[in-house]
Design a protein with these regions (language model features):
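N-proximal low-complexity "stem/linker" segments adjacent to membrane-targeting elements
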Residues: 1-27
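Short, charged/polar "capping" segments at the starts of alpha-helices
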Residues: 17-20, 45-51, 108
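Short, acidic, metal-binding catalytic loop of nucleotide-sugar glycosyltransferases
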Residues: 25-36
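Generic structural signal for small/hydrophobic residues in well-ordered secondary structure
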Residues: 38, 99-100, 155
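Active-site-proximal specificity loops/subdomain of glycosyltransferases
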Residues: 41-92
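Short beta-strand-to-loop acidic/aromatic patch adjacent to the donor-nucleotide binding site
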Residues: 91-103
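Conserved donor-nucleotide/metal-binding helix-loop-beta segment in metal-dependent transferases, i.e.
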Residues: 102-137
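Catalytic core and acceptor-binding pocket of nucleotide-sugar-dependent glycosyltransferases
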Residues: 144-240
């Protein structure tokens, strides 16, 4: 079925006063993604003046009840719900682009045209939250797989198709939504088409930037959590 629009960029926010680096990254995203529709998604009980000043159009703000943004658990629950993806039904793809992400150049249409159902940075290095897990070691399930959700391109009809499974896993585990979607993708009979780790690394890098760039040989489309993982390293590749 043809879609009226190929892709929408959704930037989730939860606070009225983002830090200066988040504003810088947001201005960059608005500039680089200028030919694509951008939606700021946030609670209905905050002031958006700072985001408007950063270049977001008031008509591009989608406000939802505040309880969806009160904590990581609430946000994870939202991104496991069919209703969330249904908001964007006129689009084939949704790019989740969190405020701690940076885009180097606009390759969004090209990534959509590759036909994957889900693309995110691969888990090649053990994240801190997994290192510190005292109850259950999730790393064997994650290692080498594609799925980080901070910058992730998702085919909306596929997310809606499997959202009930995601909600069930979330109710059982309350883990991060990107890990929930990984569990769903590993179920027998579930088909969520993803690139391999090397291809996904060209879409987005999160951890170990120097090692990741040595592996890819070129700058990725985006980076996520760059202030946490390699802020000084990435400065050389970002305009002042």
């Amino acid at each position: 079925m043809p879609y009226p629009h190929q892709v929408v960029i959704v930037i989730p926010v939860y606070k009225p006063f983002p830090d200066p680096e988040e504003i810088r990254a947001l201005r960059r995203a608005v500039s680089v993604f200028s030919r694509h529709p951008i939606r700021l998604l946030g609670p209905d009980d905050i002031d958006y003046s700072v985001y408007l000043d950063a270049g977001i159009d008031r008509c591009s703000i989608i406000q939802m009840p505040g309880h969806h943004f009160r904590g990581i658990k609430a946000y994870n629950r939202l991104l496991c719900s069919k209703g969330f993806y249904a908001i964007f039904d006129v689009f084939e793809y949704i790019l989740i682009f969190q405020t701690d992400a940076w885009v180097f150049r606009d390759e969004l249409s090209e990534w959509c045209e590759r036909g994957y159902d889900y693309i995110g940075s691969p888990w090649l290095w053990r994240p801190e939250r997994v290192k510190n897990s005292q109850i259950l070691d999730l790393w064997p399930l994650m290692k080498g797989r594609v799925g980080n959700g901070g910058v992730s391109l998702r085919k909306i009809k596929v997310m809606k198709k499997y959202a009930l499974l995601a909600r069930i896993f979330f109710a059982l585990t309350a883990k991060n939504e990107d890990f929930i979607w990984l569990l769903v993708s590993l179920l027998p009979g579930v088909r969520i088409k993803k690139p391999n780790a090397d291809e996904a690394l060209k879409f987005c890098i999160e951890m170990e930037p120097e090692e990741a760039l040595n592996r890819t040989g070129s700058l990725p489309f985006t980076v996520h959590a760059y202030m946490r993982y390699g802020a000084d390293y990435w400065k050389a590749y970002m305009p002042d």
